């Protein structure tokens, strides 16, 4: 069986990692400031002395899939001769299990002359706080007491539930690789495999990978399977290109960084694009991207016009208006006049409206159940209960609280639920 090329051509040293210089300098500076590391390595890579770097208890590598987050940790461990204790947080989820695996790894003696140990929690954003009992808390505990380097990786560490990790870790953002970066790696692999690959074919693979080098290498291996030694653009067209799934953070980033109107508009064709969710996110991220008040006003004006189209669609079901709403909310907010040069990384916040809805989900569920119960027992419609009855009962209850107990006894409903509904 052929070795997967993503493993065969995985970078072994810092030098081999493509176009992540800033991340490499920051990570090396943290390691060299706090732990034992070879002098040659520190001289070459430890370029920073920031207080934030020196005081950080751990490192959290952030960025989209396939850009080298795990690879950079493997290369680091090899460079400084540390034994790597690797845990995928998506697989080992409970606090007890994490303690067992990490504890065993730290207790066991290192073989082969390692200088120390390094703990890697891969894909920590795969933890779901409620389901994965104690997983997040255990990782925080380990970081607080560990005398060895602890590094984590995540595609999206900015979910509010991961705040405890961000508070104690140095967040290092790895950037998405450019099309040229990916093509250069693919070209080198083709040469090593003795394959003749058309430049246009490699560019097609790189373009559809959206900076995910792992995906691009996997695609190249697929196209050159069965000993095939020639790759043309016709081969790509015949098999078909990758249509990647994008997170909302990635969708927003592509919209704001689009170079022209059609590039931003085309994002709506991605299978993971949800226009209702996107609208909520766009509403709150405009001030994050455009600091200038004039640019902010232009973007919000276009988004408000898109909202008018969406309101009309919901009211009249005229779905032929949706393209106009998408053009305004995608290309409209992306292509503003005198658009500034955007920084390499933008921290997009989770929409507060969605957070509030999540927090009030149980209260809304109980309210809806109570409305339905009242409608059935009083032989009226739910809309009548919501639009009229609740307001009448609420007005009475504010003057006479005893009505809550009387309603509770008459209808067999918890008095606290009635109170929450009316007051």
UniProtKB/Swiss-Prot annotation:
Sorted alphabetically, the keyword list is: ATP-binding, DNA replication, Nucleotide-binding
CDD domains in alphabetical order: AAA, HLD_clamp_RFC
* Xref: SUPFAM superfamilies: P-loop containing nucleoside triphosphate hydrolases
Tell me which Pfam families the record gives: AAA, RCF1-5-like_lid
Q: Which GO terms describe its molecular function?
A: ATP binding; ATP hydrolysis activity; DNA clamp loader activity
Query: Binding of ATP: at which residues?
Result: 63-70
Q: Does the keyword Nucleotide-binding apply?
A: yes
Superkingdom, taxonomy of origin: Archaea
Which intervals of the chain form a coiled coil? none
GO biological process terms on file: DNA replication
InterPro entries in the record: AAA+_ATPase (IPR003593), ATPase_AAA_core (IPR003959), P-loop_NTPase (IPR027417), Rep_factor-C_lsu (IPR023935), RFC_lid (IPR047854)
Q: What does this protein do?
A: Part of the RFC clamp loader complex which loads the PCNA sliding clamp onto DNA.
Question: What's the family?
Answer: Belongs to the activator 1 small subunits family. RfcL subfamily.
Subunit architecture:
Heteromultimer composed of small subunits (RfcS) and large subunits (RfcL).
Q: Which HAMAP family match?
A: RfcL (MF_01508)
Q: Which protein, by its recorded name, is this? A: Replication factor C large subunit
> Which source organism?
Pyrobaculum islandicum (strain DSM 4184 / JCM 9189 / GEO3)
């Amino acid at each position: 069986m052929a070795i997967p090329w993503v493993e065969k051509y995985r970078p072994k040293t810092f030098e081999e990692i493509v176009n992540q210089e800033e991340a490499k300098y920051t990570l090396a500076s943290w390691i060299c400031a706090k732990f034992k590391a070879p002098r040659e390595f520190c001289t070459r890579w430890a370029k920073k002395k920031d207080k934030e770097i020196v005081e950080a208890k751990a490192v959290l590598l952030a960025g989209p899939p396939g850009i080298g987050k795990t690879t950079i940790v493997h290369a680091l461990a090899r460079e400084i001769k540390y034994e790597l204790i690797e845990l995928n947080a998506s697989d080992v989820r409970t606090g007890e299990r994490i303690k067992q695996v990490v504890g065993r790894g730290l207790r066991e003696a290192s073989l082969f002359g390692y200088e120390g140990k390094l703990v890697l929690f891969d894909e920590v954003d795969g933890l779901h706080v409620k389901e994965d009992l104690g997983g997040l808390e255990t990782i925080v505990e380990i970081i607080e007491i560990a005398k060895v380097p602890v590094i984590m990786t995540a595609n999206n560490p900015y979910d509010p539930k991961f705040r405890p990790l961000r508070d104690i870790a140095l967040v290092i953002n790895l950037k998405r690789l450019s099309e040229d970066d990916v093509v250069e790696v693919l070209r080198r692999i083709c040469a090593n495999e003795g394959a003749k690959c058309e430049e246009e074919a490699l560019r097609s693979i790189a373009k559809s990978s959206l900076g995910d080098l792992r995906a691009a290498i996997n695609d190249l291996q697929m196209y050159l399977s069965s000993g095939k030694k020639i790759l043309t653009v016709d081969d790509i067209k015949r098999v078909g290109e990758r249509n990647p799934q994008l997170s909302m953070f990635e969708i927003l980033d592509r919209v704001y960084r689009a170079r022209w109107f059609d590039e931003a508009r085309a994002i709506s064709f991605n299978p993971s694009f949800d226009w209702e969710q996107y609208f909520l996110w766009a509403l709150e991220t405009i001030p994050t991207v455009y600091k200038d008040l004039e640019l902010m006003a232009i973007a919000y004006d276009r988004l408000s016009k898109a909202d008018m189209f969406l309101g009309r669609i919901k009211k009249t079901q005229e779905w032929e208006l949706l393209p106009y709403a998408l053009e305004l909310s995608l290309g409209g907010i992306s292509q503003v006049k005198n658009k500034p040069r955007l920084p390499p990384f933008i921290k997009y916040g989770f929409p507060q409206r969605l957070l509030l809805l999540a927090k009030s989900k149980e209260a809304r569920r109980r309210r809806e159940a109570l409305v339905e119960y009242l409608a059935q027992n009083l032989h009226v419609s739910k809309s009548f209960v919501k639009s009229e009855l609740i307001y009448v009962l609420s007005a009475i209850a504010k003057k006479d609280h005893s009505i809550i107990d009387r309603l509770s006894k008459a209808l067999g409903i918890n008095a606290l639920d009635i109170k929450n509904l009316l007051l």
